[in-house]
Amino acid sequence: MSRAKCIMVQGTMSGAGKSLLCAALCRIFAQDGLRAVPFKSQNMALNSFVTKDGLEMGRAQVVQAQAAGVEPDVRMNPILLKPSSDVGSQVIVNGEVRGQMKASEYFRTKRQLVPDILKAYDSLAEEADVIVIEGAGSPAEINLKSEDIVNMGLAEMVDAPVLLVGDIDRGGVFAQLYGTVELLEEKERRRIKGLVINKFRGDVEILRPGLSMLEEKTHLPVVGVVPYLKVDIEDEDSLSQRLEMRDGKKPLDAAIIRLPHLSNFTDFMPLEQHPLLGVRYVSNAHELGAPDLILLPGTKNTVDDLLWLRQCGLETALLKLAAKGTPVLGVCGGYQMLGQTLDDPTGSESGRQQTLRGLGLLPTRTVFSEQKRRAQVKATVAAVPFAGAELEGYEIHTGVTEAEGEPFAHYPDGGREGCVQGNVFGTYLHGLFDTGTLTEALAGWLCRRKGIDPSDAALIPMEEYRRQQFDILADGVRGALDMDAVYAAMGMERR
């Protein structure tokens, strides 16, 4: 098998739409009969995923792999940075934690990771037909270029042709694209094979004069004007929109606590698809109101976020509602918070040795450690309202939780998972709603509690829904992008 061809998508800024455009290209190439795989040398995100072999990677490349119809593989994202503070991150290399680093330390040493990047890339290149590479931020960050391993620095390492994407929805797209090109070195400009304007609303004809001027000034072709596509696909850049989401048209109200270090918000995306279940994020006691369900999500810093709950008044409001019978479900860090105590004997979670009082809603005790559990798991829900629901998800957490109450679920070997006490539920399982069975059971239970008939609420299985959204995305991008030019940039003929 010959070595894979490649195409790289770089952007004028964060949020330009690189991730979704890469997902679209992965889907298009797969539809064209090619084995496509995504690649991003370094990703910074709080949302992560555990592969079948128990390794951790960024979810953006997971989504792109799903779009391509291939199994997510840690080689697709060899370096993952998970921010733990404003100036530091947990550094994960080849799916395993390498340690905590301040930004300045990582910047000085990251070139040492180039062999890991190239080994992962070269291995994928031996198996795939096309590699769709995603850059990060902007290639024109002149203060970072000397040590670049994710934009033009990576493009040079793997000899990748580049599409440069600008976001017109936020305005100034011509300045974005022209300014980025002008700040690049000549050899970097030569790598750019086309400019793409993304998230356009309106009549393309109005843009034509500007496109011609842009081509004249940059000496580069505009190979596509991609419309603003209304697709529901997991996207790190869409988090801000989701956090502002308010759905008051559905009869059931689920309130997700908007923790400062919120991670894996994707756990709750399947709930948004249920026709009876409205999902919203809340960040203070006033916003909480009187929901039908409270969801306490995962977090990159359980201790700090528990203290935040206390300081902002949400702890008091949550405890009052729980005492009145409002169901509360905590996932991962949220599960840990629901317990009696959280013990950090080495300071691995909070930076100092301490034992913290939990919310006291579950008979559990958590002890943090440096060791991280990473595993894909299957389980069957044991909690009475949802008993029998089959789950497929993953665990990714530090700390061990001892539970004295009833389990939330059982593993296939009979082992206990999570904890239940009355109307309060806790679990370590991320992705617990993806199969749809728990979503249906949960919504049905909430409907019965409220006297609502759930029989007319048909839920599309998440996997099928995801496929539909990928196809909508691919159709929209294929219709807007000059795919002949994209194939030519890779040295291939269009399929």
Where are these regions (language model features)?
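Catalytic nucleophile serine of serine hydrolases
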Residues: 332
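Conserved catalytic-site region of short-chain dehydrogenase/reductase
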Residues: 337
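Conserved P-loop NTPase catalytic core
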Residues: 348-375
